[in-house]
Amino acid sequence: MTELGTDLSVSSIKVAGIVVDMVDEIVHGAMLGKRGIATQIEDWCESGFVDHLFLLLLDKGFHVYLTADHGNVEAVGQGRPNQGLAPEIRGERVRTYRSETLATESAAANSNTYRIDLAGLPANFMPLFAAGRTAFLQQGEPAVVHGGISIEELIVPFVKVMRI
């Protein structure tokens, strides 16, 4: 934290983007679902790191905002499609294909999935989503995952941090 404070003291620095991936690490290592995640995040916050970081930034005159790149959802494995290298990206909630034929065949072979055309994606980028609260994991395996389009995965916080 001392080194960060020194780096932020340079008068030419007007904007700083700081990525703290601890919450993501906690989520990806989750064994006890969202309840366990909440407890681990609370324990981490009690370590003082977040308070020290916010105070350092505020003391240096920065406007501080807290956000996330995505949310998470508790899901249960519906099985992993056995496709070798067919999908371009193999996520827990979404698989993407470069071939319409492969995407269509995969959707037909996996009934608990759906396809949706999303504006802004390249024409040869075809996502196949796990439906409901399921994921492309071993059948019945519970996990906290992301990559789908549920409300919990899409809406993220954007909070201004201020002294009170």
Task: Please describe what each predicted stretch is.
Residues 1-164:
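Feature captures the catalytic ectodomains and active-site-proximal regions of enzymes
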